[in-house]
């Protein structure tokens, strides 16, 4: 075993050699090098000595987590290989803003497919890095959450996050062949959450902000995925994430009521700052910069100036704002700040507090069922957009 310690994450795209995709390749510990970046956190743990199991929604969510566990190695069809001459993502009849640029039109068909793979890989890589962050935070919450129910659920979530890291990593290595480094803004928000000493701020940052945004981003990619394996993988991950977000809202709604007004304001400000960083995180620049011959700053300006990014950002924060309101963190002091970001209007969207038990307890769907459900959802969204634009 070789462990190399670094002062920060890698900055270059990591390519995986074809030989390492051979299932029969037997790697010894001496053949593997782990690259580790050290972070320090003043974590304060707690025992719970009464082992009280409250008969409530959190207990039910914990039981569901055990019942609905899935195995990333056998429940996904890893034998499926998407045709290399077809894009991994894209919606028929929908033109993306960058496809109007001369730089994209001048690409050959092969280059357009290659660009699609790199752009998809850049987004999926952020999913992978974010899930590792969620894995680390969930493991911290096991130690420092004060109640027995919260510790038990965080333990089950830790295993969920490990499974998500596993499947995203495997897809990128085996089906794409490379992954991108972490977006600096995503790294900033993960650092902010992981190194804070207060367990409930970790909880707010991860369960409400990061997981809420991830749930929306995963859904967006699932709807546009052409790769059957990728679409099904995302669907299974979304099922888990929906439970995680619901757990966070149900637990925090009660907990926030135990805090003083000053403590609530402090946490409301923390959530706002996490949203600001996460809003910038949505802009990935590397693939577009490489293939469309733009600087990172030009890509950022282009992304911020087109309506598609505003629409995508709205979709993301429509999952976060109502949840912040539900747990009591849309205070009078931060509301104008969210208004300035242009996302306060989503406070009235449906929150994830109410649980559709019939939906959340369904057995794992087949790939065909996932595709049919995804196509139906996409059709409804496109019809709504068409009606809004008419």
Describe each PLM feature range.
Residues 1-139, 143-151, 174-181, 185, ...:
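Terminal targeting/low-complexity segments that flank the catalytic cores of oxidoreductases
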Residues 123-124, 154, 204, 234:
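Short alpha-helical scaffolding segments that buttress acidic/His motifs in well-ordered protein cores
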Residues 127-135, 157-172, 207-218, 237-248, ...:
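Alpha-helical transition-metal enzyme core signature, strongest for iron centers
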Residues 145, 162-165, 169-179, 229, ...:
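A generic secondary-structure signal for well-formed alpha-helical elements
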Residues 151, 155-158, 231, 235:
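Short, well-structured alpha-helical segments
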Residues 165-222:
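Active-site-adjacent scaffolding segments
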Residues 217-277:
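Aromatic-anchored, glycine/proline-accented short structural segments
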């Amino acid at each position: 075993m070789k462990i190399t310690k670094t002062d920060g994450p890698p900055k270059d795209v990591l390519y995986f050699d074809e030989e390492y995709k051979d299932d029969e390749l037997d790697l010894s510990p001496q053949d593997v090098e782990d690259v580790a970046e050290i972070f320090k956190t003043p974590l304060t743990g707690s025992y719970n000595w009464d082992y009280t199991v409250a008969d409530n929604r959190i207990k039910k969510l914990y039981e569901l987590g055990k019942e609905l566990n899935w195995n990333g190695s056998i429940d996904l069809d890893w034998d499926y290989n998407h045709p290399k001459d077809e894009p991994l993502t894209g919606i028929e009849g929908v033109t993306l803003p960058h496809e109007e640029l001369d730089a994209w039109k001048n690409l050959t068909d092969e280059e357009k497919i290659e660009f699609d793979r790199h752009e998809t890989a850049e987004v999926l890589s952020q999913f992978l890095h974010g899930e590792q962050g969620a894995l680390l935070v969930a493991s911290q919450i096991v130690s420092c959450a004060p109640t027995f129910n919260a510790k038990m659920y965080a333990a089950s979530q830790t295993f969920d996050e490990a499974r998500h890291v596993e499947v995203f990593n495997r897809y990128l290595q085996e089906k794409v062949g490379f992954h991108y480094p972490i977006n600096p803004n995503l790294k900033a928000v993960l650092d902010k959450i992981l190194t804070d000493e207060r367990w409930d701020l970790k909880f707010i940052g991860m369960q409400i902000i990061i997981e809420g945004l991830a749930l929306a981003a995963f859904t967006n990619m699932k709807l546009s995925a052409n790769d059957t394996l990728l679409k099904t993988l995302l669907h299974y991950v979304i099922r888990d994430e929906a439970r995680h977000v619901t757990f966070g809202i149900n637990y925090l709604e009660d907990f926030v009521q135990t805090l003083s007004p000053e403590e609530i304001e402090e946490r409301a400000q923390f959530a706002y700052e996490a949203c600001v960083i996460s809003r910038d995180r949505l802009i990935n620049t590397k693939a577009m910069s490489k293939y469309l011959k733009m600087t990172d700053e030009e890509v950022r300006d282009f992304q911020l100036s087109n309506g598609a990014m505003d629409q995508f950002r709205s979709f993301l924060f429509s999952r976060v704002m109502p949840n912040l309101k539900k747990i009591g963190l849309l205070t009078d002091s931060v509301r104008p700040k969210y208004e300035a970001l242009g996302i306060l209007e989503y406070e009235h969207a449906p929150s994830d507090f109410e649980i559709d038990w019939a939906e959340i307890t369904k057995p794992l769907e087949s790939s065909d069922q996932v595709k049919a459900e995804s196509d139906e959802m996409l059709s409804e969204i496109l019809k709504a957009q068409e009606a809004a634009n008419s």
